[in-house]
Amino acid sequence: MLNDLYEEIKLRKTQPREGSYTNYLFDKGLDKILKKVGEEATEVVIAAKNNEQELIAEVSDLTYHLLVLLAEQNIPLSKIQAELQNREGKLSTTRDRKEINDL
């Protein structure tokens, strides 16, 4: 499903459709896309304190905007998948992850 959505987003970049929100983001450029990613990430944090449906909706929005960002930067989704697979099964401790203790 994410692959299909990513492919559709990439298609909008090369074959714009009038009135498309995705094309609006591409037309406005990287700064607008980054602003939306930041807004949606904040909304995820807030939604996590509320209810499940709101969290699902906000995570979906964030995921979409992250895919737009990847397409804007010409980063294939396969590189993200490869990075996640590379991390699978790796052990780390809180000592290895300084940022955990800083929260």
Swiss-Prot record:
Q: What is its EC number?
A: 3.6.1.31
**Which Pfam families has this protein been placed in?**
PRA-PH
Superkingdom to which the source organism belongs: Bacteria
Q: Does the keyword Nucleotide-binding apply?
A: yes
Q: Where in the cell is it found?
A: Cytoplasm
Question: Which terms are listed as keywords in the entry?
Answer: Amino-acid biosynthesis, ATP-binding, Cytoplasm, Histidine biosynthesis, Hydrolase, Nucleotide-binding
UniProt keyword annotation of ATP-binding present: yes
Q: Which GO terms describe its cellular component?
A: cytoplasm
What pathway is this protein a component of?
A: Amino-acid biosynthesis; L-histidine biosynthesis; L-histidine from 5-phospho-alpha-D-ribose 1-diphosphate: step 2/9
Query: SUPFAM superfamilies of this UniProt entry?
Result: all-alpha NTP pyrophosphatases
Q: Which reaction does it catalyse?
A: 1-(5-phospho-beta-D-ribosyl)-ATP + H2O = 1-(5-phospho-beta-D-ribosyl)-5'-AMP + diphosphate + H(+)
Question: Where does the record place a coiled coil?
Answer: none
Q: Which GO terms describe its molecular function?
A: ATP binding; phosphoribosyl-ATP diphosphatase activity
- EC main class here is hydrolase
Report TM segments. none
State the Gene Ontology BP annotations. L-histidine biosynthetic process
**Major location (coarse):** cytoplasm
- Family membership, please give it: Belongs to the PRA-PH family.
NCBIfam families given in the database record:
histidine_hisI
What name is this protein filed under? Phosphoribosyl-ATP pyrophosphatase
Q: Which organism is it from?
A: Listeria monocytogenes serotype 4b (strain CLIP80459)
Which gene is this protein's source? hisE
